[in-house]
Amino acid sequence: MNITLILFLIGILGFVLNRKNIILMLISIEIMLLAITFLILVSSLNMDDIIGQTYAIYIIVVAGAESAIGLAILVAFYRLINSPVKNPRSNYSGDPAPPSGGRGPYLHFNLLPVVSSCNLIQSRNYSSVLHRKIPTHTSCVWAGLNPSFITGFSDAEGSFVVTILKNPRYKIGWNVQARFQIKLNEKDRALLLLIQNYFDNIGYISKINDRSTVEFRVSDITSLNNIIIPHFEKYQLITNKYGDLVIFKQIVSLMLENKHTTLEGLKEILEHRASLNWGLSKTLKESFPSIIPVKRVKIENNILSNLSSLPLLPGGGNWVAGFSSGEANFFITMSGTKVWLRFSIAQDSRDILLLKSLVKFFNCGYIAQYKNRKVCEFIVTKINDIIIYIIPFFDQYKIEGSKYNDYVKFKEAAILIKNKEHLTEKGLNKIIELKNSLPPPASLEGGMNKNI
């Protein structure tokens, strides 16, 4: 009886003193149950009732088994939540294409949104990355995104931003912040989580909001210098965003030297900021009228912009898949019973060299230039080109994100047209259904000049 009482008291004390540790609390409860079971057994053994003794033994066997299983589960769970997450990039060793006609090891998150090997945490992560450098290994052998895909997607949707705002709390009256960001529709949150995971979970993913937007942002200066910039130096940008990266890197270097904390250093940063994106704001121009912008690197000086380089570029297929996941459009248009398909990528006219390179890359299509807008567009409309070149490419190098569903419907319509099923009522109705489920074509106002 004394042993039973001691066990019971130990269980109670353990429960009370360890309320913040669920593991120890549950162990304490198991000890109390063991004490009660032992009490029943001792009491029944002092009786001549064979039924009571049998019942007591039964209770001990069941309770013991339950306790053992419960503790085993708890220990396994405890080890799981405390085990380190393997860096998903640690197995990269090259940038090969996935197997022809197949998905290969790359994750198709539209079909499998939960990535067991990724630490997908929708919160800020400001862990120190002072000594972390971007790995040199690059072959995607885990359920993640190819490095060249990430660069292509960043060429489409990423931004290198430097904000300079008045703030009296700072010594010089101005606050400087540099950041890399990708902003998308909420439906592409899963894709941003994969991108964040590739970058060692630095930065943060914004919470769900009423604007239906989601943003991946990295503003920690050390993370930018040690992880973001080295990635884009190894897997280079191809659009005019390459020029933004060059200036952005220079500004980050100045900030690492604490130049942003002095007025002279701020002016030096402003000279670079004036050539980044859309230049200086009206407030900055009025406050610093003597700023002379540094010369922006010309994209023609980037060897990747050569018209013949894209097909030869290592990882070029993955870059195009990433870029298309951000910028491509898959359209179905109809007039009565006539059906047309259109695959297109529109860009600022500054990137016309890139679009001309896509014509060579896909071996089809043409470039459209618009008179009233500084926009040019790579367009493929011939059904044979779509069947022979476009669909096989995207079957091998997958579109990621919500745009994948557009591609699947586009492909289904193309197959129906190829097989002449659009000439039947059933086939035409199916194409109408597919068309109505796709986003409407964007209107590019103004006249068009067609260049082959």
Swiss-Prot record:
Stated family: In the N-terminal section; belongs to the complex I subunit 4L family. In the C-terminal section; belongs to the LAGLIDADG endonuclease family.
Protein's UniProt name: Probable intron-encoded endonuclease 2
Top-level taxon: Eukaryota
Keywords: Endonuclease, Hydrolase, Intron homing, Membrane, Mitochondrion, Nuclease, Transmembrane, Transmembrane helix
Region (ndh-4L intron 1 encoded): 81-452
GO CC terms, sorted: mitochondrial membrane; respiratory chain complex I
GO molecular function, one term: endonuclease activity
Membrane topology label: Multi-pass membrane protein
Main location: mitochondrion
Known function: Mitochondrial DNA endonuclease involved in intron homing.
Region (ndh-4L exon 1 encoded), start-end ranges: 1-80
UniProt enzyme class: hydrolase
Keyword Nuclease: yes
A GO biological-process term: ATP synthesis coupled electron transport
